[in-house]
Design a protein with these regions (language model features):
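Extra-cytoplasmic beta-strand recognition segments
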Residues: 1, 23, 42-85, 118-124, ...
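Secretory/extracellular carbohydrate-interaction modules
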Residues: 49-55, 77-78, 203-268
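Ligand-recognition surfaces built from glycine- and aromatic
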Residues: 147-168, 312-340
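Extracellular carbohydrate-recognition regions
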Residues: 1-7, 12-14, 152-188
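Extracellular carbohydrate recognition and processing domains
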Residues: 90-132, 272-284, 288
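Extracellular beta-strand ligand-recognition surfaces/modules
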Residues: 70, 84-85, 118-156, 285-289, ...
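Short carbohydrate-recognition loop motifs
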Residues: 8-46, 188-211, 258-260, 317
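Beta-strand acidic-aromatic groove motif in beta-rich domains, primarily in extracellular
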Residues: 34-38, 77-89, 133-134, 233-243
Length: 340
């Protein structure tokens, strides 16, 4: 999509960096200093839809820490332009320009033009409390010249996943699709009730597992931690390497004072466990490190469980928060980073 000007976007065979096609962006006229934004939606909100008959929920595709690359080629009349990548935050609505990654489509010092595709790459900085709604590129006309027409080609956009961020749940808004359908921004969910209560994410159910998910299904080796507070009931857990409603691992607390590692293959089963005296309404920092087929579980920075899954191991997946039975679990925040 594009904004700021009347712009034509078309898929074309005229140019290509790789393959046979690219995205052609045309603006008929730009005054000096004006700009055009071309962007990709990483996350959708209710205002993007005319109705909610499908009752969707969304998690972002792009996260802080990810690297974005794109191939860009300008027409001869557009090579005096500068392009600057940006992201847009769903929570604040703020546009964050990554000016250090800006690219001149020609070399103004050498007075040369470039008639080939150029690679522009940028890494999104580590942030707290941000949901990336858009990633994009802003094209600026020279400050001393009007320009028209403006034409560039974009190709080979790649998202290289390297999430490194933290979310406090009291910063997240609710997405309100209609009177009956609301959800916490950035989360999808399975069963039960998922809501914000006094700044905490609250997940509750009555029989089958109630779960909320976020992240990208191709995340592989990472460290994931959350501040968790068991409420009512006897099953309270965080989820990792989630591959949909039927497959994931989980770590957390269970009845009879146990710390447990589960594996879900349609239903949950215990992989390993150890004694751990936990209390309702007490906060714990629950952490999992997953690397290859090995998992280590920490509580308050102390390692309690280690496991190597040698049978149909799940090697990638997103993250989540869950409970089971007549339980209610609270989560204050979470943090994730990739392992080296």
């Amino acid at each position: 999509a594009s904004r700021n000007q009347k712009v034509l976007l078309t898929n074309t065979k005229e140019e290509a960096a790789g393959g046979e096609r690219s995205l052609k962006v045309i603006a008929p006229y730009l005054h000096k200093g004006e700009s055009v934004q071309v962007y990709f939606k990483s996350y959708y909100v209710p205002q993007d839809f005319q109705d909610s008959r499908y009752d969707p929920d969304f998690s972002p595709i792009v996260y802080p820490g990810d690297k974005i690359t794109v191939m860009i080629k300008a027409s001869n009349s557009s090579q005096q332009m500068t392009v600057c990548p940006f992201i847009r935050d769903r929570i604040t609505g703020q546009y964050i320009k990554l000016e250090k990654a800006a690219l001149h489509l020609s070399d103004p010092l050498q007075n040369t033009q470039n008639d080939k595709f150029q690679k522009l790459e940028f890494q999104i900085p580590t942030y707290e409390d941000i949901l990336i709604e858009e990633i994009g590129w802003e094209f600026y006309a020279p400050i001393d010249n009007n320009m028209g027409p403006f034409t560039v080609f974009l190709d080979d956009v790649e998202i290289i996943q390297n999430p490194n961020y933290m979310i406090h749940f009291d910063k997240l808004p609710m997405e309100r699709w209609n009177v009956l359908h609301t959800c916490v921004a950035g989360l999808t969910w399975l069963r039960g009730k998922v809501e914000l209560e006094d700044g905490w994410l609250a997940v509750s159910g009555c029989s089958a597992p109630a779960e909320a998910y976020t992240g990208e299904i191709h995340w592989k080796n990472y460290r994931f931690q959350s501040i968790i507070r068991p409420g009512k009931g006897d099953t309270h857990r965080i989820l990792f390497r989630v591959q949909g409603a039927m497959r994931c691992y989980a770590a957390g607390f269970m009845k009879d004072n146990r710390l447990v590692l589960w594996k879900k293959e349609k239903d949950y089963r215990v992989l390993c466990q150890c004694p751990f005296t936990w209390e309702s309404n007490k906060e714990y920092k629950l952490t999992v490190e997953v690397n290859g087929n090995k998992t280590v579980i920490y509580v308050n920075d102390h390692a309690y469980l280690e496991w190597e899954d040698k049978e149909n191991a799940y090697n990638e997946g997103c993250i989540g928060f869950g409970t089971e039975g007549s339980s209610r679990t609270f989560f204050k925040e979470y943090e994730i980073c990739m392992l080296e």
